[in-house]
Amino acid sequence: KFVPISCPMPTNRQPKSLVVNINENSVKKMPWFTNXXTYFGXT
């Protein structure tokens, strides 16, 4: 499932949006999947 992410990211580049392929079950286990934004450790 592709989820559009719109959020400021702690990186030099701050893309307005990016698409990340994630697993819903995995998302529930992600402690950093929370308000404001979502940082997928990526660049």
UniProtKB/Swiss-Prot annotation:
Originating species: Heliothis virescens (Tobacco budworm moth)
Keywords annotated in UniProt: Hydrolase
The keyword Ubl conjugation appears for this protein: no
Signal sequence bounds: none
Origin organism lineage: Eukaryota, Metazoa, Ecdysozoa, Arthropoda, Hexapoda
Entry's EC annotation: 3.-.-.-
Name by which UniProt lists this protein: Canavanine hydrolase
Subunit structure: Hexamer, composed of two different subunits.
GO molecular function: hydrolase activity
Function: Irreversibly hydrolyzes L-canavanine to L-homoserine and hydroxyguanidine. Has no activity on L-2-amino-5-(guanidinooxy)pentanoate or L-2-amino-3-(guanidinooxy)propionate, or on the L-canavanine derivatives methyl-L-canavanine, L-canaline or O-ureido-L-homoserine.
Regions that span the bilayer: none
Enzyme kind, highest EC tier: hydrolase
